Curated annotation (Swiss-Prot):
This is Eukaryotic translation initiation factor 3 subunit A. It holds the Pfam family eIF3a_PCI_TPR-like. The gene is tif32. Component of the eukaryotic translation initiation factor 3 (eIF-3) complex. The eIF-3 complex appears to include tif32/eif3a, SPAC25G10.08/eif3b, tif33/eif3c, SPBC4C3.07/eif3f, tif35/eif3g and sum1/eif3i. This set of common subunits may also associate exclusively with either moe1/eif3d and int6/eif3e, or with SPAC821.05/eif3h and SPAC1751.03/eif3m. The eIF-3 complex may also include SPAC3A12.13c/eif3j. The keyword Phosphoprotein applies. Keywords: Coiled coil, Cytoplasm, Initiation factor, Phosphoprotein, Protein biosynthesis, RNA-binding. It is found in: Cytoplasm. Belongs to the eIF-3 subunit A family. Residues 309-492 form the PCI domain. GO terms for cellular component: cytoplasm; cytoplasmic stress granule; eukaryotic 43S preinitiation complex; eukaryotic 48S preinitiation complex; eukaryotic translation initiation factor 3 complex; eukaryotic translation initiation factor 3 complex, eIF3e; eukaryotic translation initiation factor 3 complex, eIF3m; multi-eIF complex. Residues 793-865 have a biased composition (Basic and acidic residues).
Length: 932
């Protein structure tokens, strides 16, 4: 079908007619050829928009994603300079239709699943499961795969197509952001993790291309505040969806994207934006159990925002105190794990805009120096004082117990209790190792006692010690026989240094290591005290060094100035070269873009020509196949020739006739052969064969049954022998184990007694605590009710005083309002009186003027009557000749009345001669003339 050459209305009408005839493919092809026509590129956006809407509907109906993509690209190139709104409407309609089809498919699949379940209360049995597998019944997963998955794939392709069309266009930024957010919600709603990863990669590639082709027409400008904010909002939405889908690697890459955008921007980001950025980092680091960078993120967040400062300060100090002293970075000796941890933390620190990885002591010192502790609650300040300033291993747990209870009241602070306990245990063992060589495990358990559910058992303590030994923080050995722990003191081992712990005294290894240093310091102090020559020599050396330094200052200053000048010169040259290189790159990009545009146009034209040629070929092939089908039907009706539908594509009329002749010959041969075989088989030979074989089959069946019986008896005998041997062995095992039964029962009884005793003690202790807590709550409630009654009485008195004051103020306002109304009424009456007097004065003047006008009109009327009387007396008779001449009463041509100033015969007299009738209106100009 040739592409329509008419108006858009005709194209739509033709498409509607084809749709009505259920020829959707033909309608789609017609609209597609109209859109890709060369003259359609110069059309207006509003004229092509209805065609594009119908084209998109057909593409969605037939699930033709590639054709929709090509049409949308062509439409965008045609109207992007004239009508951006049209592009937005079309792509929005495309996404809405695809979403609608997915929802319809989901509803249909759910309906099929519900209809398949006959009994909602019936349970699955093995028989029903096997029957469903054998019969091939559709399950929900199969239904979804058959109905929903194709439309999900189409919707995903639609999102990718639209994002690729809208990318890196400053006019389509808002729609690009909306479609990207919609794609994020699509991945979240249908749990499409793979598609979400691909979507993130697609957005990253778009952003990379935007920075490469920044000089292209309509390219986005990341230096613009609104554009940067849109991309940051998209990345934050991407981060939220990654967290919801539990794709932590993608969440980390999203954080890196946000950091890259913030770094790329030449403008300083807003404090609110940085606050949101650091809040997300805080959550991610907490989920990853990276307490060091979690505390660093809280520190940065406190620096860049002032909202909720007391609450933020609490978390800054609490997170810093929760950083483990035993860190992966402090593993003893070179280790791949340690190097990986260091490089990972260094890379993560860059996301916080930190030049190097922070440490626990630097974070705490920085927070204290900036006065963060003054904003914290009293419990947090007490925690810092006990843990960092007044740490005492014998009473630390008892002092911290109320603070831990306070932290456990909130879910946000309760998550820091376990890391705080790790810090307490580390400090405890480090200081115990400085005082004791060996200590009982029970004593350590008493020192590290916390209330449930935060208490430690011996297994947890042992695991903690082994972890500390592994990372080089401890040198502790466990003795399970004596139930004690011993601290190793190798005199020649490297002493463990930790800036996070308080040194109570020097260890033997530290004394051995620092012995030479201490001797050198002592000898130096002795020489300084008793050897005057040595002191004089030191003084001379210091003076000589000072003179050398002073002499080299000027030379160094000149060298610095020269180096600075050289750097400025090189920087200027580098800027010039960079500008030239940028201009060359821009020219190359413009040329490349022009070549790509021309190549794209050529490709589209070749594609159109190829498609037209293919369409013509298909039409010719369809005509040939239709003719072959008609001939095949005729041959089938006449000669019974059956032709396969696939073979019709390679057959013509001559081949079909030859096939008919060959078919007739085959039928004749087959008929003759069947007649010959039937004649030969009229005897009963086959029946005789079968009768003779019956006894043989019966004998074979008897032999087979006998053989099977022998095999069965043999296997049964073997099975009995095996069972007897197993039974004898089991009896022997029972006799052997019976010797230990008494020991086992005694051991079990001891354990039960210990557990019962511990339970009774814990029960009594808990009961005492509960009774004390109830008494305390009762007192608190009584005090609260008493304070509330006092407060209500005070509020009632204050309310009565306030009502009295309001009443007096209201009375004063009413008095002032009445005074103002009196003055206003008096002024209004005076004004009305003046207006009445003025109206009366004007009325008198009007009557006087009216009387004068009537008098003047009367006099003028009398004069006019007299003048008319005079004119009537001197006028000629009606029958007199009026031509000028010597006739009586006439006027000669030489008379003055016939001059220019007079009036001719048959003309009306001048206006001055016409007096108005009595009572007629006389204008003021006439009045003046009449008075003169």
């Amino acid at each position: 079908m040739a592409p329509p050459q008419g108006k858009p209305e005709n194209v739509l009408r033709l498409a509607d007619e084809l749709i009505a005839l259920d020829q959707h493919s033909s309608a789609l092809q017609s609209l597609h050829e109209t859109i890709v026509l060369k003259r359609s590129r110069n059309a207006q956006g509003f004229s092509l928009e209805p065609i594009m809407m119908r084209f998109i509907e057909l593409c969605v109906h037939l699930r033709k994603g590639k054709i929709a993509k090509e049409g949308l690209y062509t439409y965008k190139n045609a109207v992007q300079n004239t009508s951006v709104t049209a592009i937005e409407n079309v792509v929005k309609h495309f996404i809405e239709l695809a979403n609608k089809r997915v929802q319809e498919a989901q509803e249909k699949a759910d309906k099929i699943s519900v209809e398949y379940v006959d009994d909602l209360e019936a349970t699955e049995t093995p028989e029903s499961i096997m029957m469903s597998l054998v019969s091939g019944d559709l399950s929900k997963s199969r239904t979804d795969r058959a109905l929903v998955t194709p439309w999900l794939k189409f919707l995903w392709d639609a999102y990718r197509t639209v994002l690729d069309i809208l990318r890196n266009n400053a006019r389509l930024e808002v729609m690009y952001q909306l479609i990207a957010n919609s794609a994020f919600q699509f991945c979240l709603k249908y749990q499409r993790k793979t598609e979400f990863r691909r979507l993130c990669e697609l957005l990253r590639s778009h952003l990379g291309n935007a920075s490469k082709f920044s000089n292209a027409p309509h390219s986005i400008n990341l230096n613009d505040a609104e554009t940067m904010q849109r991309h940051l909002d998209m990345r934050f939405s991407q981060l939220n969806v990654a967290v919801e889908l539990e794709l932590w690697q993608e969440a980390f890459r999203s954080i890196e994207d946000i950091h890259s955008l913030l770094t790329f921007s030449k403008r300083a980001p807003a404090a609110v934006m940085l606050g949101n950025y650091y809040r997300k980092l805080i959550k991610i680091f907490l989920v990853c159990d990276n307490y060091l960078l979690h505390a660093a993120a809280w520190n940065r967040y406190f620096t860049f925002t002032n909202v909720q400062k007391p609450a933020t300060a609490n978390f800054v100090i609490l997170s810093a105190l929760s950083i483990p002293i035993i860190d992966a970075n402090k593993l003893s000796g070179p280790s791949i794990e340690a190097e990986d941890a260091k490089s990972k933390n260094a890379r993560l620190a860059l996301l916080l805009n930190l030049s190097k990885t922070p440490t626990r002591e630097t974070l705490i010192k920085d927070a204290i120096s900036r006065g963060v502790l003054s904003f914290c609650d009293q419990a947090i300040r007490d925690l810092y004082q006990i843990l960092e300033v007044e740490f005492h291993p014998l009473s630390i747990c008892k002092k911290l117990q109320p603070i831990i209870k306070r932290l456990a009241e909130s879910n946000d602070t309760a998550q820091y209790i376990r890391p705080l306990q790790q810090v307490i245990l580390t400090r405890l063992f480090q200081q115990l190792s400085q005082v004791y060589d060996s200590i009982s495990l029970k004593y350590v358990m008493d020192l590290a006692t916390f209330e449930e559910p935060y208490d430690f058992n011996p297994g947890q303590i042992e695991k903690f010690i082994m972890n500390g030994n592994k990372k080089g923080a401890f040198s502790i050995r466990l003795n399970h026989i004596e139930n004690s722990i011993s601290f190793s003191s190798d005199l020649f081992s490297n002493p463990i240094k930790s800036s996070d712990s308080v040194s109570l005294q020097s260890t033997p290894s530290e004394l051995i290591t620092s012995q030479l240093t201490r001797i050198a310091k002592s000898l130096s102090s002795v020489l300084m005290r008793f050897d005057t020559d040595f002191c004089l020599l030191r003084k001379q050396q210091a003076e000589a060094a000072y003179e050398r330094a002073q002499a080299g200052v000027e030379q160094e200053r000149k060298a610095v100035i020269a180096q600075r000048s050289l750097l400025e010169l090189r920087r200027g040259q580098a800027d010039t070269l960079a500008t030239q290189r940028e201009a060359e790159l821009a020219a190359q990009r413009a040329l490349k873009q022009k070549q790509e545009s021309e190549a794209e146009s050529l490709r589209v034209q070749e594609e159109i020509n190829k498609r037209n040629a293919e369409r013509i070929r298909r039409e010719k092939e369809a005509i040939r196949i239709n003719e072959a089908k008609k001939l095949a039907e005729e041959l089938k009706a006449k000669g019974g020739l059956e032709v396969n539908a696939e073979d019709l594509e390679h057959l013509d009329a001559d081949k079909l006739r030859a096939m008919q002749i060959e078919q007739v010959e085959k039928q004749n041969k087959s008929m003759n052969e069947r007649l010959r075989v039937i004649g030969k088989r009229i005897d009963h030979l086959e029946r005789a064969y079968r009768r003779e074989a019956i006894p043989l089959w019966e004998e074979d069946a008897k032999q087979q049954a006998e053989h099977d019986r022998e095999i069965f008896y043999e296997r049964e005998k073997q099975r009995k022998e095996v069972q007897e041997r197993k039974h004898e062995q089991a009896i022997k095992d029972k006799k052997a184990f019976a010797q230990f039964a008494s020991y086992i029962h005694a051991y079990k009884q001891n354990i039960d007694d210990e557990r019962d005793k511990a339970y009774q003690e814990a029960y009594a202790k808990a009961k005492n605590v509960i009774d004390a807590e109830r008494e305390r709550q009762r007192k608190e409630i009584f005090e609260q009710k008493l304070a509330e009654a006092i407060r209500e009485a005070e509020e009632e008195a204050a309310r009565a005083a306030e009502e009295e004051a309001n009443r007096e103020l209201h009375e004063q306002e009413e008095a002032q309002k009445r005074a103002i109304e009196e003055r206003t009424r008096a002024a209004r009456e005076a004004k009305e009186r003046e207006q009445r007097e003025m109206a009366e004065k004007l009325e008198r003047q009007r009557r006087i003027q009216q009387e004068r006008d009537e008098e003047i009109s009367r006099k003028l009327a009398e004069k006019a009557a007299a003048r008319r009387a005079n004119i009537g007396a001197s006028s000629p008779s009606p029958g007199a000749w009026r031509r000028g001449g010597a006739s009586a009463g006439g006027v000669s041509r030489d008379s003055p009345r016939y001059s220019r100033g007079g009036y001719s015969r048959g003309s009306v007299p001048p206006r001055e001669t016409l007096a108005p009738s009595k009572g007629a209106y006389v204008p003021p100009s006439r009045r003046n003339q009449q008075q003169q």
